[in-house]
Amino acid sequence: VYTGTDTVEYLASGVPDRVFFATNESVLTTASRETLRKQAAWLRKNSDVTIVLEGHADERGTREYNLALGERRANSAKDYLMTYGISSNRISVLSYGKERPVDSGSNPLAWSKNRRSVTVKAN
């Protein structure tokens, strides 16, 4: 699972905006859970902020499969944030599947960067 930071942006200082997944997986890694804990802490302090969790996949697989996988990934992040007290009415889920790659390469490193869920401020 990709753990680099070259594609990461930040919701706030020290709060990364994205988590990464293994191939064909929507299970959160230890690193992903740590990032989401930071996001939850920031969201609790900023209770007026709503977010969209954007699920993404790499280029392999059909459009339909990757849209469903992206949705499962975003929902995994949503469920985890909710366990830390973030209300579901503050979180929207959207899947882009393979339509918005952060790296357009066709190799294992590019694919690992594209298997992600990105947290975006909605307001």
PLM regions: where:
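Periplasmic peptidoglycan-binding/tethering modules of Gram-negative envelope proteins
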Residues: V1-T50
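Periplasmic OmpA-like peptidoglycan-binding domain that tethers envelope proteins to the cell wall
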Residues: E54-N123
